[in-house]
Each structure stands twice: as structure tokens, then as C-alpha cells.
Amino acid sequence: MLLVLLIIIISLPIKISKEKPIINTINTIFNNKNGKTKVIDPIGKLEIPKINLTKYLYDQNSSLNNIEENVTILKETISKNENGLMILAAHSGDSDKAFFNDLDKLTIGDHINLKYKGKEYPYIVTNIFEQEKKGYINLDIKDESQLFLTTCSKAPHKQLIIETKKIVLTP
């Protein structure tokens, strides 16, 4: 019986989509519709040691900068100054794309590392709060470098927001 089952499983056809990217490698390889391979390099990497999260970030104009595939740089909120404001969003829940599912485990004082366009930016969590889901979030923008992370809260109709500020390293 087991041998018959193994033969059936082994003989099942496997469908591999050539249009689906291989995501979160150092370079993302994309096979487009005309069969040509396109390599998309990430522009950054988000690391949150406490929740064992490491995810690559892609240019705002890249097709890979979307919440269905990756941690996303929100287009309306990133400053042209790399040392300014950045807001990142990702799904939470039980999907394999729920990259921010454990964001609620962060506490004030936790560290987040952002590598962006060849520079490293260490951040520390300064505030954690929730807002009603309205399709936008209200943020307290300060006169300092800030990184915000946002996802759906585990509470119904709420948005979880993690506010951080850049750690200024003295030489």
C-alpha cells in the first residue's frame, strides 16, 4: 500500500510558474512574460532581532514593493533624505506573507536595524500604539529621524503602529 502511494505521489505533475519571482534573496530573479530574466536588487534590509525578522526592501517604483509580496515602503511617506522619515507596512495574520505578525511582541527599548542604500541606521522603539483602521494613519512626526512600522492589530478594526527613532552613534 505504501509503495503504491509513493508511486502516485512521485508521478503527480508539478507546475512551476515562470512568472512568479523568487523573493527575499540578495537579488530577486524575475522571469517576465517574454521569457527574459530580470534581476531586481533590493535597496535595503530590515532586521528586527527580537522577533527574528530579516526582510529585503525594494525601490518604491518596483513591482516588488507591494504588501502582497514583501515589507513595503509606503510611497507617500518616504523622504528623499535617507536620514529622514520612513514608514514600512506588512501583513500580519496566519499567511506566509504575514511578515509583521509578531510586531506586537516588540516593547519600548527594542532595537531595529535598517540598511538602506548602502548605509546602516540603528533605531530604538520609543512608542507603541493602535488606531482605528481608516485607510490612513495619524503620526506624530518629530524633528528627528524616525522609522514607523505598521500592520493590522490583532484587535478588530485596529492598526498597530511601532514608532522608533534613530540612535545617534557618537564616535
What are these regions (language model features)?
Residues 2-171:
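Solvent-exposed, non-transmembrane regions of membrane-associated and secreted proteins
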